[in-house]
Amino acid sequence: RTLDAFQDFMSATDAPWACWKAIDGSHAVRAQLEAADWLYHQICTALDCRPAAEQPKREWPLLPMEPLSQVRLDQALGEKEYRKQLKKCRKELAELHNELYRKKVPVVIVYEGWDAAGKGGNIKRLASALDPRGYEVIPIAAPTHDELARHYLWRFWERLPKTGHIAIFDRSWYGRVMVERLEGFCSEAEWQRAYDEINEFERELTDAGTVVVKFWVQIDKDTQLARFRERQNTPEKQWKITEEDWRNREKWDAYEEAVDEMLARTSTERAPWHILESVDKRYARIKAMRLVIGAIRQTLDR
């Protein structure tokens, strides 16, 4: 029975680019030599620049996404209504967080967006409703030397939440198809390949029962400029503005093109993108909380 099981999984997972080799282990030394010879043969074949074996094409059911230039940014929420909705959403999220823990359902929330769009404040309001023992906010900076020595998704796998916990990523693996693409930190072949890699990554998360919610926080160039100047002119906010922010602003059009492609190619049925219109930060905060509530309820009700 055990032998049949081994044969079944080897047949199911054998592929031209990752094939199994059965070795007779009845004679230890002969088995070692055969394994070494097989490994040597495979390495030599790879070094001879063998064309990569064609992998099966994966299909990702994608949702339509409108270009950022067409997103309406005139939505607003008054202070009184904001306070009312904030209190209500916090109560619902707190209750859902407890239920997530009891049912051992992990949640991954991704925040991407323009500099000064309001990601930090949005995360702060969302996290204020959660039990501190059951969530983590993970700010993503440039990869370390050790992280660069591995596949770019490795450092995100390392930070995924335990069952029943919530991970909030302040920037994420999508840097591969934005900043790394535009700043030349990876080749065109690498960032083109990344769309399928990311879709596969998120598919594996949702297959395992993880709730995945992705936000793009949207503002216009004029709003960004006003917020940059406010940061420059406010002593307690000056730490938020850097020369890199100004350099990125000069590449607005290139970034917008990259983001449009990212949204179009990675907004899947299981892990869709949501646009947070954040010219009015209060509106964006409540919208984010409602979307998280809806995504969690949808999973818990299955």
Short names for language-model regions:
Residues 1-302:
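Glycine-rich phosphate-binding loop of ATP-dependent small-molecule kinases
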